[in-house]
Amino acid sequence: MGVTGILQLPRDRFKRTSFFLWVIILFQRTFSIPLGVIHNSTLQVSDVDKLVCRDKLSSTNQLRSVGLNLEGNGVATDVPSATKRWGFRSGVPPKVVNYEAGEWAENCYNLEIKKPDGSECLPAAPDGIRGFPRCRYVHKVSGTGPCAGDFAFHKEGAFFLYDRLASTVIYRGTTFAEGVVAFLILPQAKKDFFSSHPLREPVNATEDPSSGYYSTTIRYQATGFGTNETEYLFEVDNLTYVQLESRFTPQFLLQLNETIYTSGKRSNTTGKLIWKVNPEIDTTIGEWAFWETKKTSLEKFAVKSCLSQLYQTEPKTSVVRVRRELLPTQGPTQQLKTTKSWLQKIPLQWFKCTVKEGKLQCRI
């Protein structure tokens, strides 16, 4: 015959402690929504079907997939830094997985790279894969490189996010953002978890000012793409370029572009003119509102769910990037209307021009 006992606790001493224990237990059982992140491109469709766990996941209908951009973690987004995270490799088949919702990206990329013999480095996008739909700046890189491999993969195992599809490889001329795919596990299946439906919009929607969405394409030329000796030029027009540096923000490049146009510093011959920016010029101009919405926590999050085989078990400390504090006399960065203020911030000074390898190079 079994014996049942009840643990008695001193009433006064443990009353408050036991109350909080009950609250924690009830809260955990009622509101637990674990978040599993696929961090290394190893997802198989069958894996998701197998993720039926006791007390957490009774149906795959409780899973909601979300695309999370890497730039929210504070990775460097300038073209020279971003492209170093990608590399060509053969013998690995591409994988594609869909996601239901994503976030707006500040920086996206679009590559058109050819081999020295003129053949294409990157494959065309398969049917159904469209460019990432929400990019403030699209960095479009054209040029040449050895491209020693069949596909361009992410060296850190992240995905390339397209329009509701994430791929392990880069497709030619198709805009993408870097990111990972995360699964939200809901307490119960909800059809309307994401209230807004995917947008069905015309290709030229960004030209409509009423859409409330503004995207700018910034063009670059690359030589030796994918090597340690890659050189990048920011394209002002088809004859005028600026030697690109990692410290240049998209906003600075747009200011520089407008300054060169309005001050008549474009190439006035049939030759190629390459500018170099004075190292003393401050290039840290940016849109602080973007980082206000991307702040992450230094706190270590303990992830507990049945997706444990798909993400790292060791909790990682998120990188925090805080916006540059504004002085009392400063205001938030505004959209450019005129070029007067930018001419003051980027003084044009003429230095001696030299001809190198048949190209005229000057310093600003």
Swiss-Prot record:
Database matches in InterPro entries: GPC_FiloV (IPR014625), GPC_filovir-type_extra_dom (IPR002561)
Glycosylation sites: 40, 204, 228, 238, 257, 268
GO MF term list: channel activity
Pfam families: Filo_glycop
Disulfide pattern: 108-135, 121-147
Keywords: Cleavage on pair of basic residues, Disulfide bond, Glycoprotein, Ion channel, Ion transport, Secreted, Signal, Transport, Viral ion channel
Signal recorded as keyword: yes
Protein name: Pre-small/secreted glycoprotein
Native species: Zaire ebolavirus (strain Mayinga-76) (ZEBOV)
Gene expressing this chain: GP
